Amino acid sequence: MVKAVVVLKGESYVHGTVCFTQESENAPVCITGEIKDMDADAKRGMHVHEFGDNTNGCTSAGPHYNPFKKHHGAPTDSERHVGDLGNIQTNSCGAAQLDFSDKIISLYGPHSIIGRSLVVHASTDDLGKGGNEESLKTGNAGARLACGVIGIST
């Protein structure tokens, strides 16, 4: 079993902690955690980005993690970036409780997300269905509110 964690923070007030657990190399990754101080009752895009570099804030995290050079999509789409985790839903207090799994990301092997960044965005991810070029790259998810480097944990 491999476990990883990321502490999210940024220039906004948004902050949180997200944990990743994968039982074996071919098992889905379980994603749990809480992200706070976002807009109430909103969907916000969340993605794994290519670089584990936050030296220039969340901007230096680079593009969505996309080793197979696919278009942006929903977590359930066959055409999606590895890093496409879709939207998180906030409650009336602006907090999102995370408890879901993903079959594409991995904590094992050459395409592991460990050492890369997790980014929470300011807008709803259109899941690649926005009908423009930016939708196919980013889902029009907007500015980067908070980010952190995904690190191996115990």
Swiss-Prot record:
Decide whether keyword RNA-binding is in the record: no
- Provide the binding site for Zn(2+): H64, H72, H81, D84
Q: How does it sit in the membrane?
A: Peripheral membrane protein
Mutant phenotype after disruption: Decreases cellular superoxide dismutase activity. Sensitive to oxygen radicals. Decreases virulence in a mouse inhalation model of infection.
**UniProt-recorded Gene Ontology molecular function terms:** copper ion binding; superoxide dismutase activity
> Which cofactor(s) are needed, names only?
Cu cation; Zn(2+)
* Positions of disulphide bridges: C58-C147
Q: How is the cofactor bound?
A: Binds 1 copper ion per subunit.
Q: Which residues bind Cu cation?
A: H47, H49, H64, H121
InterPro entries assigned to the protein according to its UniProt record, in alphabetical order: SOD-like_Cu/Zn_dom_sf (IPR036423), SOD_Cu/Zn_/chaperone (IPR024134), SOD_Cu/Zn_BS (IPR018152), SOD_Cu_Zn_dom (IPR001424)
Q: Which UniProt keywords apply?
A: Antioxidant, Cell membrane, Copper, Cytoplasm, Disulfide bond, Membrane, Metal-binding, Mitochondrion, Oxidoreductase, Zinc
According to its UniProt entry, the protein's GO biological process terms are: removal of superoxide radicals; symbiont defense to host-produced reactive oxygen species
Catalysed reaction per UniProt?
2 superoxide + 2 H(+) = H2O2 + O2
**Induction context:** Repressed when copper levels are low in a CUF1-dependent manner (at protein level). Induced by high temperature.
Q: What is its main location?
A: cytoplasm
Gene Ontology terms: cellular component:
cytoplasm; mitochondrion; plasma membrane raft
Where is substrate bound in this sequence? R144
Q: Where does this one sit in the cell?
A: Cytoplasm; Mitochondrion; Cell membrane
Q: Does the keyword Zinc apply?
A: yes
Documented EC number(s): 1.15.1.1
Protein family according to the UniProt entry: Belongs to the Cu-Zn superoxide dismutase family.
In UniProt terms, what function does this protein have?
A: Destroys radicals which are normally produced within the cells and which are toxic to biological systems. Destroys radicals produced by host defense mechanisms.
What is the protein name for this chain? Superoxide dismutase [Cu-Zn]
Q: Provide the species name.
A: Cryptococcus neoformans var. grubii serotype A (strain H99 / ATCC 208821 / CBS 10515 / FGSC 9487)
